Amino acid sequence: MPEAQLIRCPVCGATNRVPLEKIEQGLAPVCGRCKNPLPVSIQPIKVTDATFSADVERSPLPVLLDLWAAWCGPCQMISPVVEQLAKEMAGRVRVAKLNVDENPVTAERFHIRSIPALLVLKAGQEIDRIVGAQPKTEILRRLEKAIQQPQSTHR
């Protein structure tokens, strides 16, 4: 696991390198530029149509976006895997979840027709798509491959 997590300040937009040790100890990091508290979580973040741009498109890290719905059994099956990946990939990948029933604009933007769907995005651009419940090893393999690709090779 990396030694630091990159966290963008919601107030001034500065990218801050926060040691994972500090996060694991429950210490509250502050922005180096404006001194406001930084949002810290090794859990997936909840993304909405309204927050997609700030949370995903402007993320300094690649994003694994889990598109799901409450009624979807396979979505519930992979949810613990997505949570594990959020912890294991902290500092390398931002993991986010978007409920497609509550956020149809973003779901339509990416032409989501089947869930669960996991998208790997860089600067809001889709790099890879995994549809259906897959084992953690396959998701991790595809995620590692996608984040190593140059951004210009997106779909």
Where are these regions (language model features)?
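Short linker/helix segments within small regulatory modules
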Residues: 18-29
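Short pre-active-site segment immediately N-terminal to redox-active cysteine/selenocysteine motifs
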Residues: 60, 67-71, 114
